[in-house]
Every structure is written in C-alpha cells, then in structure tokens.
Regions:
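Intracellular juxtamembrane helix-capping segments at the cytosolic ends
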Residues: 1-2, 200-214
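Loop-to-transmembrane helix entry/capping segments in MFS-fold secondary transporters
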Residues: 2-14, 127, 213-226
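Symmetry-related core transmembrane helices of the 12-TM Major Facilitator Superfamily/SLC fold
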Residues: 37-54
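Pair of pore-lining "gating" transmembrane helices in MFS-fold secondary transporters
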Residues: 83-104, 192-193
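Short amphipathic helix-loop junctions that connect adjacent transmembrane helices
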Residues: 106-130
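C-terminal ends and interior cores of transmembrane alpha-helices
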Residues: 167-181
Length: 249
C-alpha cells in the first residue's frame, strides 16, 4: 500500500507544471487575451482523452453479491458527511476558499494587465508579460506541494490549513498594495504566498478527506470536496467578483 501523504504530492505536482507551461505558451505567443488559447486547450484535451483511454482498466472495487442504492451509485451519500460538525466546517471553508481561488484565477492576470492604461506602468516588463509574472504563483505551488509531507508531519493538518487561510489574506493584501514597478516585489511575494495558500488547503484538504472518511465513501467525499471548491465556490466567487468589478471599475 502507498503512503498517500508522501505519494500523492509528487504526482499532483505535474498538473501544476502543465498549468505553468500553458501560461507561458499563451503569453509568449501573444495569445493571453486571444480566442486561440481555447483552441490550444481543446487540442490538449483531445490528447489527454486519448491518453486516458489508453490506460489499463481499473473498475471500482465491489464485494461479491453487494448491491448499491441509487443514492450510493451517484455518490449522494457523501452529503451525509455534512451532519458531522467537523466535516461541515471543513466543506464550508472549502466553499469560501473556492470563491477566493476563483477570484485570483479569473482576475489576477487581468488586474496586472490593467496597469497598461497608466502611462507610468504601460511599458514595464510585468505588464507586457503579466501572465508570466503571475505564473510565479504556480512555480511556488510546485515547491509547496512537494513540501506538504514535511509540514503535515511537523505541524499537523489543522495548523497547515490555518496557515493557508492566513496566506490567502496576505495574497490579496500584497496584490492590493503592489504595482508593476517599485511595488513589483509585493506582487512577486503575493505570488509566492499563493503557493502556500492554495496547496496548504486544497492538497491538504484532499488528504484530510482521505484520512477522515470511511474507505467506501472516500471517492464520493472527494467529489463533494471538489464540488465545493471548483463548483459552488467557483460560482460564488465569479458572481461576487463580477458584481464588485461592475460596480467599482
């Protein structure tokens, strides 16, 4: 059996490396604000689908003679976890942090690019290559992913998640005071902090679910965790940020 805490991060880090490659490719080819990036993503998706279909079959484990209800088949039994106060608090935190994640993913690059409308910053490197600057966040993410086993063994999962929440405050605070020239260091530090903010909750959160949910419900619970962050959290974050931007910008 694999040690999930030690084995998962080195595998998960390759997703972030792909993220960085996509950001650099679209920026260096002049397509960071072009429809072409969607064509690139579509091609990459077809390649990924072909690779996925080539993988060995791995059917879900099922005991002989075992039957499942419709609720279990669709993974809806994971919602029973919300009756547990600890799990309810975790999933609500996932919802809020998912909203914050959506805000930085959707508007982080746009925010830095917006400085081009100010003559003082228009020709700065960080504005012309804003996507590359923001990709420092993902570079930081790769390093913190690999450091997760150490931090979990040193501080425990609760303290690691608390560090993540503090890091999110620093992320947005530094972005709000930074600028592309003399304040560039704040933006860069905010990108470095992002790695901690994201990994210490999202990756550690997956490990938290894995260690606190019975084996037969883990897949459904991981799906619920993903739905809270990238589903309901994404809807909440994109809706609120859209309203605020329309009102104040």
């Amino acid at each position: 059996n694999l040690n999930v805490v030690k084995s998962f991060p080195p595998i998960r880090v390759w997703g972030t490396i792909g993220f960085i490659a996509a950001m650099w490719f679209t920026n260096l080819t002049g397509n960071k604000a072009s429809v072409n990036q969607f064509y690139f993503a579509g091609i990459a998706s077809f390649i990924l689908a072909g690779y996925a279909l080539s993988l060995p079959k791995c059917p879900p484990s099922k005991q002989k003679g075992e039957s499942k209800s419709i609720v279990q088949t669709f993974g809806l039994d994971a919602f029973k976890l919300l009756a547990n106060y600890k799990m309810l608090l975790f999933f609500l935190s996932s919802l809020m942090l998912g909203a914050a994640l959506q805000l930085t993913n959707m508007y982080g690059d746009t925010y830095l690019d917006f400085f081009k409308y100010f003559p003082k910053y228009a020709d700065s490197f960080s504005v012309k290559y804003s996507t590359i600057i923001m990709s420092i966040s993902q570079v930081s993410e790769t390093l913190f992913i690999l450091a997760i086993p150490f931090f979990l063994s040193k501080f425990g999962i609760k303290k690691v998640m608390l560090i993540s929440m503090i890091a999110w405050v620093l992320r947005f605070g530094l972005l709000s005071f930074g600028n592309p020239t003399d304040g560039l260091w704040m933006i860069i530090v905010s990108c470095i902090v992002y790695g901690m903010a994201f990994d210490f909750f999202n990756i550690s959160g997956s490990l938290f679910v894995n260690s606190n949910v019975p084996k037969e419900n883990r897949a459904s619970a991981q799906g619920l965790f993903m739905m809270m962050t990238n589903g309901f959290g994404a809807i909440l974050g994109s809706s609120i940020s859209g309203i605020l931007i329309d009102k104040y910008f």
